[in-house]
Amino acid sequence: MPLHNVVVTGIGPVGAFGLGADALSSALQTNQPLAQPATKNQGLGLATDLACEIPADSFKIRDVVPKSHRKAIKVMCPDIESALAATDSAIRHANLRTTTTHPEETPIPDPLRLGCQLGAGLIAADIEELGGAMTVAAPEGVVDVQLWGREGMERLTPLWMLKYLPNMPACHVTIVHGAQGPSNTMTCGETGSMLAITEAARVVERGDADACLAGGTEDRIHPVQRLRQHLSERLGEGVPFQDTGATPAQGGAVLIVESLE
């Protein structure tokens, strides 16, 4: 069976520069400084308090989610919201149509031929949500497994886990846009997004889909994520042209990978 030629027809980046290809291009052309003092959880004693945060006015999650799916917003962490915003931007950039971007028109491509491959990191839970449960389970500063199972877990909401499973960004994206083709989530750290794009290209190349939503998303400015990077000595003041230091960021990007035919 002949292989299909694969092309990228749209991009949807989201990050400290804002949302969309134009926002990214503008930031690059104007040398816009993106690393700023973190707006939350300062004074943690980390190697750096700088962070690249998505501006609050970049997008509203209600604008990229149809009314039929808005009840699910309450179980969306920043990683999921970034994935949905990036996907919406990429679809519009590629002039495709889905049941969400163009609800009154016929989707292009066929939903059965639209796949989704996304990279995702280890999503950290909100400290506010875990705080009460941990306080009960660790009255003397050490977690008591028996207390955690008997009393701590009762303080978590029933839908708590649905906010933090790494496959949830792809789950929400495929539901919102009706993508019923091959779907997968790559949880391989920094390589996850590249692996997702590579798999998407292979899916289209062999003819299992006409197009795929491919990329990744992660929130590395979460205090737990920042602390994890600090303890592993991966966090530090980022200095241009030096190979030491790293500045945490949140964001992601989705590409539209299509068959040229």
What spans do the regions from the language model cover?
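Acidic, glycine-rich active-site loops and adjacent beta-strand->loop/helix elements
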Residues: G12-V14, A120-I123, C188-G192, G216-I221
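Short pre-catalytic strand/loop immediately N-terminal to key active-site residues, enriched for Gly-Thr
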Residues: T157-M161, G181-C188, Q242-T244
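Active-site-proximal alpha-helical scaffold in enzymes
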Residues: A83-N95, P166-A179, S183-G215, P248-E261
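Extreme N-terminal starter segment of soluble prokaryotic enzymes
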Residues: P2-T9
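Short acidic, glycine/serine/threonine-rich loops at helix termini
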Residues: L19, I127-G132, I197, H222-R228
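Conserved beta-ketoacyl condensing-enzyme motif
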Residues: V8, Q29-H177, R220
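Short Gly/aromatic-enriched secondary-structure transition segments
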Residues: G20-Q32
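Glycine-/small-residue-rich "gating" segment that lines the acyl/pantetheine channel
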Residues: A138-E154, T198, R202, T217-E261
